[in-house]
Amino acid sequence: SNKRANVFNQGIRNMVLGREEELTTGDMLMVVKNKYKNSPTPSPSLNGSLNNATNNVNGLTTQATRQVTQLPSGGGKEIEKPILTFIANGDRAVVRRVRNVREFYGFRFADVSLEFPDYNNAEEEMTVILDALMTEAPALTQEQNEQLFQHVLEDYEDIPLKADRMKKVREDEYYNALQVKFGYAITCHKAQGGQWAHIYLDQGYMTDEMLTPDYIHWLYTAFTRATEHLYLVNWPK
């Protein structure tokens, strides 16, 4: 469950990594809601070109636009800098810097520098909604999303046309804040499509009545995530 994953994540952060801050440099995260970004524009000051690349993560195709720039000096080495235009539910990210923690609309946000290891370590500066980190739901609940939407919409009520108001909401940095959870421990559902060398598996509380075909399917999915070693945690003898 998400609740149990939260317990393991906090235990790993506090007792193994010695981290007490809510979010800090080096934290491993997992994106829990798709996020679309505007396509990048090449810098006019550099001799650059844009080309597209795709990556398939957990069955979802993520679009990354790579900006290839040439250093101004003749014969300089080309630098390829991936720029993500779509961040998928399930993508991994590593925190490089956290700043400007603030509260708006009853939610807490932070500006975070993130590195995405699945995309050649592309780096992005993003606004992250901190409330999603420890929620017991897979991401913000429908009620929370609706609350945020209504509060943001109020800021644009002076715009007469509804279509224009909605466009502003869709572009708003707080409404579009990236939703992430810690990625040290994740649910079996979230792990679908991925594999790791070593897996520590905790099935949680179980009774004989829970031994259904759905449980067998869950068990198969969980066991096949490991490519080398599978460790059973808190498993009944």
Set out the residue ranges of the language-model regions.
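Core RecA-like ATPase module of SF1/SF2 helicases and allied nucleic-acid translocases
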Residues: 2-236
